[in-house]
Design a protein with these regions (language model features):
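Conserved Class I SAM-dependent methyltransferase catalytic core
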Residues: 217-281
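Conserved AdoMet
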Residues: 30-105
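Conserved hydrophobic residues forming the short capping helix/wall of the S-adenosyl-L-methionine
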Residues: 14, 107, 158, 230, ...
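Non-catalytic accessory regions of SAM-dependent methyltransferases
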Residues: 1-33, 38-41, 48
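Mobile active-site "lid"/loop adjacent to the S-adenosyl-L-methionine
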Residues: 181, 192-222
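Conserved SAM-binding loop
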Residues: 92, 120, 143, 215, ...
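Conserved SAM/SAH cofactor-binding pocket of Class I
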Residues: 98-199
Length: 284
């Protein structure tokens, strides 16, 4: 079957389950054929073998069931990196790049040295940690995650992207970090979804690990814990920077202010929602 006909049928199948049906189909077929998507515009009349059609059909069926394209491909672009992904971690999303941007802005305003240390809590694929490490090659970045599989995955992503100034440890938040502190900046994209949120039964998140998505107290329990504990691991004048839910900024700002952080501020994502909040620890 010709590429153009195969893709046309795939668009029709995925159009009922995905808002990005055309892109999904092209990415999946490019993966099967080991070509770029531009190949389809250059060679639409090329024939696809029966074996490749069967593999493509299997991927389409899985996508029809809602399985995320990133899991089907096994990788996802984030910042300037190409990251391996797996069902043991969240899929890196564009909104989380805002967390990287804010952290870089903060670090640009500080006196960076070769001893500048950055901590990423709940690192998952290592997306945030590795993006910061890539942009700040003279810094030391440590990423931690509770899940051993995530720690191993983040390490592979460091190797894949030739990043040597980031290391990854297994830890439940700060538990294994006593000897690693202090840090000039602590960043985190923690679980922040309410366990009763209806969106957990919709879209890609149905296939992502719930432990990386949900938190008690309306999604704020892990954020509360991090805010309470972070000062013990921050350097003087250090910053704590979070990603959080679109409707949680006011609560996060209150937690930070009550704990004694200063320069508390929130930053919007691409959709105009307050998505990242930071505070500086100035107490001795």
């Amino acid at each position: 079957m010709r590429i153009e006909l195969l893709l046309k049928g795939a668009y029709e199948r995925l159009n009922f389950v995905s808002e990005t049906a055309q892109l999904d189909a092209q990415l999946l077929l490019a993966h099967v054929l080991d070509v770029s998507t531009s190949y389809f515009y250059t060679w639409p009349e090329k024939q696809v073998s029966d074996d490749n059609i069967r593999v493509f059909d299997d991927l389409l069926s899985r996508r029809e069931q809602g399985e995320p394209v990133a899991y089907l491909l096994g990788h996802q672009a984030f910042w300037s990196l190409e990251l391996e992904v797996s069902p043991c971690t969240l899929i890196p999303r564009a909104d989380t790049e805002r967390l990287v941007e804010v952290a870089l802005q903060v670090l640009e305003q500080t006196d960076q040295t070769p001893t500048t240390r950055i901590l990423d809590l709940g690192t998952g694929t290592g997306a945030v940690a590795l993006s910061l490490a890539a942009e700040l090659p003279h810094s030391t970045v440590i990423g931690v995650d509770l899940i051993d599989g995530a720690v191993e995955l983040a390490g592979r992503n460091a190797t894949r992207n030739r990043i040597r100034n980031a290391t990854f440890l297994q830890s439940s938040w700060f538990d294994a970090l006593q000897e690693q502190a202090p840090f000039e900046v602590i960043v985190s994209n923690p679980p922040y979804i309410d366990p009763d949120d209806k969106h957990l039964s919709q879209g890609d998140v149905r296939f992502e690990p719930k432990s990386a998505l949900i938190a008690d107290n309306h999604g704020l329990a892990d954020i509360e814990h991090i805010v309470a504990t972070a000062p013990d691991f921050l350097a003087p004048q250090g910053y704590l920077i979070f990603e959080h839910g679109y409707d949680q900024a006011a609560a996060v700002r209150e937690y930070l202010t009550t704990r004694g952080f200063t320069k508390v501020a929130s930053f919007q994502d691409l959709g105009g929602n307050d998505r990242v909040t930071m505070g500086q620890w100035t107490q001795v």
